[in-house]
């Protein structure tokens, strides 16, 4: 009788449920939500050291970098958009050589990972953490939720308004956006 029970416990679907439950319970014990360390904001964009870049770059006006790296056409087109709209004062491409903003999150398999959002954008009344997204993968919801929590905690700690904004390629390619505020309005409609 015990042999039959062990065989059933070894079925792939049962093993998956058991492992998933163990990961969830272990994460409750070891993953602790922390207030973000704000040393990143003590770093001035003007302190960024020159670096060589092996990816494509573009020259823009509203950024401290003389050439801004981009990974794909969506990023390039969004950079051009940021540089031309009136409600963006400044922006920077976030990567390890620039702002190095990393937000920890727990992925779909229960592993702790670091998420590096695409851009930090300054508007007259708020700071934005912006992610451009061509394809929605399995961890996007977890990254979005953690980045929203991060923005709320940083807002409370700095008395500056921080928000997270994900710009999907399908929305961006649809056009008709004349400001970053247009994307914030769209994002708030999509939440409800």
Q: Predicted regions span which residues?
A:
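Intrinsically disordered, low-complexity, repeat-rich regions
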Residues: 1-116, 122-128, 132-192
């Amino acid at each position: 009788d015990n042999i039959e029970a062990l065989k059933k416990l070894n079925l792939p679907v049962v093993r998956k449920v058991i492992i998933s439950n163990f990961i969830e319970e272990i994460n409750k014990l070891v993953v602790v939500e922390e207030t973000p360390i704000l040393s990143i904001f003590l770093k001035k964009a003007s302190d960024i050291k020159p670096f060589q870049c092996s990816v494509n770059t573009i020259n823009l006006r509203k950024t401290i970098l003389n050439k801004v790296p981009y990974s794909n056409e969506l990023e390039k087109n969004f950079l051009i958009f940021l540089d031309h709209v009136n409600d963006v004062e400044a922006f920077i491409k976030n990567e390890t050589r620039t702002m190095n903003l990393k937000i920890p999150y727990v992925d779909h398999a229960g592993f702790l990972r670091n998420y590096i959002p695409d851009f930090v954008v300054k508007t007259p009344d708020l700071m934005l953490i912006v992610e451009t997204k061509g394809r929605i993968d399995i961890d996007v919801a977890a990254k979005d939720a953690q980045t929203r929590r991060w923005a709320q905690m940083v807002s409370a700690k700095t008395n500056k308004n921080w928000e997270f904004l994900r710009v999907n390629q399908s929305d961006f390619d649809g056009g008709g956006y004349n400001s970053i505020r247009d994307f914030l309005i769209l994002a708030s409609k999509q939440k409800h």
